[in-house]
Curated annotation (Swiss-Prot):
UniProt-listed NCBIfam families: bla_class_A, carbeni_gen, PSE
Family listed: Belongs to the class-A beta-lactamase family.
Domain of life: Bacteria
Keyword Acetylation set for record: no
Cleaved signal peptide residues: 1-17
Cysteine pairs bridged by disulfides in the record: C72-C118
Entry's induction text: Constitutive (at protein level).
Species this chain originates from: Pseudomonas aeruginosa
Keyword Signal in record: yes
Pfam family, one: Beta-lactamase2
Extra remark: The class A beta-lactamase family has a specific amino-acid numbering system, sometimes called Ambler or ABL numbering and often misspelt as Amber. A multiple sequence alignment was used to derive a consensus sequence and then the consensus was numbered taking into account insertions and deletions. This allows use of identical numbers, e.g. for active site residues, despite differences in protein length. UniProt always uses natural numbering of residues, hence there appear to be differences in numbering between this entry and some papers.
Record note on quaternary structure: Monomer.
Protein name: Beta-lactamase PSE-1
Residue numbers annotated as active site: S65
Length: 288
């Protein structure tokens, strides 16, 4: 974490990576697209030198649960502005429960702080906790307005859980682009969108994610660290956004989105693993 924070002021202008450097990654992604009959978007941003590479980086994909990082960043921002108290509590009502709420479903009739709701949704992807946060930050519109404020003109949130995960082709609602969300994560963790204290908190929530062990974490190079958030939805949507770094490697922001495929969840997970491994190999091969 100390290494990650050391780069918080290093946000150079984005420069495109040489195509040869990521040639194998592109070949691997294309092969997976064909094998799964899927649409795939990938973005990679090196925060040390601003080097950027993408595949379908400007295409729209369903946000699914990757929106939760944005919603919690909005809560942290609003707390800085004195608009909300993260220690304020919300009563958990049975009528508010939605599908997949492993933390909140056990606390019906109790109260939860907004801070704890963010911890729950960021570490377990609890959907009711996410809706609690959305209610506190002005709903989907509040999140989208925040994104526009920090310069993200693409990412948008229109609905709450679980409807936002619908994932229909051509539906602009609740979508992002791999390039846009990578840039937004850069602003959250290394830019001026949040204070250093809240950058640390957001990073900590992502580091402590409990539901991504079978994705990029499973092929993370030895000695590397990861902070991530995944998502899944209809019509084959599967996604992950992550920051990876090591003692000798500046943070790299990675976003991978899959959509419009009939592949099983296991196959989609395997696709993310293979793409991640290919990306990591670009950086580990440089140090061999």
């Amino acid at each position: 974490m100390k290494f990650l924070l050391a780069f918080s002021l290093l946000i150079p202008s984005v420069v495109f990576a040489s195509s040869s450097k990521f040639q194998q990654v592109e070949q691997d992604v294309k092969a997976i697209e064909v094998s799964l009959s899927a649409r795939i978007g990938v973005s990679v941003l090196d925060t040390q030198n601003g080097e950027y590479w993408d595949y379908n980086g400007n295409q729209r994909f369903p946000l699914t649960s990757t929106f939760k990082t944005i919603a919690c960043a909005k809560l942290l921002y609003d707390a800085e502005q004195g608009k909300v108290n993260p220690n304020s509590t919300v009563e958990i009502k049975k009528a508010d429960l939605v599908t997949y709420s492993p933390v909140i479903e056990k606390q019906v009739g109790q109260a939860i702080t907004l801070d704890d709701a963010c911890f729950a949704t960021m570490t377990t992807s609890d959907n009711t906790a996410a809706n609690i946060i959305l209610s506190a930050v002005g709903g989907p519109k509040g999140v989208t307005d925040f994104l526009r404020q920090i310069g993200d003109k693409e990412t948008r949130l229109d609905r709450i859980e679980p409807d936002l995960n619908e994932g229909k082709l051509g539906d602009l609602r609740d979508t992002t682009t791999p390039k846009a969300i990578a840039s937004t994560l850069n602003k959250f963790l290394f830019g001026s969108a949040l204070s250093e204290m809240n950058q640390k908190k957001l990073e900590s929530w992502m580091v402590n994610n409990q539901v991504t062990g079978n994705l990029l974490r499973s092929v993370l190079p030895a000695g590397w660290n990861i902070a991530d958030r995944s998502g899944a939805g209809g019509f084959g949507a599967r996604s992950i956004t992550a920051v990876v770094w090591s003692e000798h490697q500046a943070p790299i922001i990675v976003s991978i989105y899959l959509a419009q495929t009939q592949a099983s969840m296991a196959e989609r997970n395997d696709a993310i693993v293979k793409i991640g491994h290919s990306i990591f190999d670009v950086y580990t091969s440089q140090s061999r």
